[in-house]
Amino acid sequence: MLEQMGIAAKQASYKLAQLSSREKNRVLEKIADELEAQSESILNANAQDVADARANGLSEAMLDRLALTPARLKDIADDVRQVCNLADPVGQVIDGGVLDSGLRLERRRVPLGVIGVIYEARPNVTVDVASLCLKTGNAVILRGGKETCRTNAATVAVIQDALKSCGLPAGAVQAIDNPDRALVSEMLRMDKYIDMLIPRGGAGLHKLCREQSTIPVITGGIGVCHIYVDESAEIAEALKVIVNAKTQRPSTCNTVETLLVNKNIADSFLPALSKQMAESGVTLHADAAALAQLQAGPAKVVAVKAEEYDDEFLSLDLNVKIVSDLDDAIAHIREHGTQHSDAILTRDMRNAQRFVNEVDSSAVYVNASTRFTDGGQFGLGAEVAVSTQKLHARGPMGLEALTTYKWIGIGDYTIRA
């Protein structure tokens, strides 16, 4: 089965690579329209997936990721339309010039070819990834989690209808709908057909892909994100940022998981934090230095376990640790961070600059929420993933991350001397 999918995707990629920006946008507009026109079939499929997942004991955080509503589906369709409005990087001349030999040389952006994406209970990923791949002239093979099998099948059927109505092969966007985990291992060895693999899921999935894949892998998306509250931070303003970073949508990878508090501001900051977190329904996991003071406040507090500093809670839970200074905060982030998103709240711009220079994450913020690490917020449109590695792509992966380049030499029967 996967062999045939690979062949179909590779053939489709050749046709997609030749499309003009106008032709690609016409396909995306059709997909957005069909997602809305056929929303009932997608929502019905999703309702069945959610019911099964709840019966199987899936966590509330994962159920939130899995669930679609009419409003969420409309947002997904609107995101596709936003991709239409983005500049098409394919064909862009990155640099070039005329050599001494007279050869005119260009470095030009081109599609990667076929993208493979493995993800878990995130039905929006199906459309986000498909739209970005189509915009950049790439075919895509999708493998969603078993929890989303009905939703993904219904969504891909709608996308393929739109493709065919525009005269393009259905092989441009395909989904592996068999939940057999053995197919993941088989997919990881499809380097004959797939040019780049992107896993979106937990640490176990990323480890599996790194160890078994014969395809280049872009990993990331695991977000043990930190906010450091410097001694000069404005408490009321800092709390607004922390509430946003923790509670806006706790099941996302750019949500803050650990709060590092400078010891010199702790006495005034912790009571205010407890009050705010109680109002927000957040459970605090406090270290020994913060525990007694936080227990005196209204928020729910437990003693932090050492391993929780490495946890991506994806829930209304927040570690709180007292640190001696900026050096201590940076050391903690280096030990426990996942190079996703980290922030400093401060009025001291020298400390801010040190934090930016010394914290080696894909996104680093000064006096801003970690929740900004998102393709849409960065002006990239829907993102295919957030990469926390350094090669090929880093941070939210928009259109350019789905391209490579080729060198083009144009001469007049020019020969090398």
From Swiss-Prot:
Q: Which GO terms describe its biological process?
A: L-proline biosynthetic process
Q: What does this protein do?
A: Catalyzes the NADPH-dependent reduction of L-glutamate 5-phosphate into L-glutamate 5-semialdehyde and phosphate. The product spontaneously undergoes cyclization to form 1-pyrroline-5-carboxylate.
Protein known as: Gamma-glutamyl phosphate reductase
**Keywords tagged on the record:** Amino-acid biosynthesis, Cytoplasm, NADP, Oxidoreductase, Proline biosynthesis
What protein family is recorded? Belongs to the gamma-glutamyl phosphate reductase family.
Provide an example Pfam family for this protein. Answer: Aldedh
Superkingdom of the source? Answer: Bacteria
Q: Tell me a GO cellular component.
A: cytoplasm
Pathway(s) per entry: Amino-acid biosynthesis; L-proline biosynthesis; L-glutamate 5-semialdehyde from L-glutamate: step 2/2
**Chemical reaction(s) catalysed:** L-glutamate 5-semialdehyde + phosphate + NADP(+) = L-glutamyl 5-phosphate + NADPH + H(+)
Principal location? cytoplasm
* EC number(s) per entry: 1.2.1.41
MF (Gene Ontology): glutamate-5-semialdehyde dehydrogenase activity; NADP binding
Task: State the compartments where it is located.
Answer: Cytoplasm
InterPro entries xrefs: Ald_DH/histidinol_DH, Ald_DH_C, Ald_DH_N, Aldehyde_DH_dom, G-glutamylP_reductase_CS, Glu-5-SA_DH, GPR_dom
